[in-house]
Amino acid sequence: MAGKNYRAAAAQVDRNMEYDLVDAVAKVKEITNVKFDATVDVAVKLGVDPRHADQVVRGTVMLPHGTGKTVSVLVVCKEAKAAEATEAGADLVGFEEYIEKIQNGWTGVDVIIATPDVMGQLGKVAKILGPRGLMPNPKSGTVTMDVAKAVKEVKAGKIEFRVDKAGNVHAPVGKASFPADQLVTNITSFLKEVMRLKPSAAKGQYVQGIAVSSTMSPGVRIKREKFVA
């Protein structure tokens, strides 16, 4: 059934056409035909070579209207910071017991935040957390002494993104049930941050393609004029 729905949705999209952002969002909402609240994603093809460290694009952005997803957060810290983390809304708070759980294969959260003083011990499980995108990192704000701020930002819709080996960067920007204007605002915030992070070493056209899609829908290409550099 999913294949049939996808084919029906694909038939409504001109794959060679680039839509205005507002029209692209409207099209994705129109063709999303699933029984659950589908996630809306944006993918950007960048003119960078991620094999070179000075062309890696990674960052974070606060989506004004959040992702629509309930994000589960683990804060790894010592006792002195535990109450602060809990009060800020962390779902799980602890230290050595969670490192042990992770060593045994547990990775049942969406985001892990850690204080700098536990990173030495957390390094023991870097090989488990890294491939899953869960390893705390100072650049993304997930290694910090201000755990309350970090937890609140993640819960409010802060997302992290990083260019992949093929030069693409993608991010969830909301749910198909969001009003169109909220999706447009979230997408614009994400694209502006990607633009801001253009590496000085990148040659040629930076933004080579943008597409918006939802779970089980084809990508709808977006006009790049406003986002080309």
Swiss-Prot record:
Biological process terms in GO annotation: regulation of translation; translation
GO molecular function: rRNA binding; structural constituent of ribosome; tRNA binding
InterPro entries given in the database record: Ribosom_uL1_bac-type, Ribosomal_uL1, Ribosomal_uL1-like, Ribosomal_uL1/biogenesis, Ribosomal_uL1_3-a/b-sand, Ribosomal_uL1_CS
A single GO cellular-component term on record: large ribosomal subunit
Alphabetized UniProt keyword annotations: Repressor, Ribonucleoprotein, Ribosomal protein, RNA-binding, rRNA-binding, Translation regulation, tRNA-binding
Pfam families linked: Ribosomal_L1
Function: Binds directly to 23S rRNA. The L1 stalk is quite mobile in the ribosome, and is involved in E site tRNA release.
Family the UniProt entry places it in: Belongs to the universal ribosomal protein uL1 family.
Quaternary organization: Part of the 50S ribosomal subunit.
UniProt cross-references to HAMAP family, sorted A to Z: Ribosomal_uL1_B
Protein name: Large ribosomal subunit protein uL1
Protein source organism: Chlorobium luteolum (strain DSM 273 / BCRC 81028 / 2530)
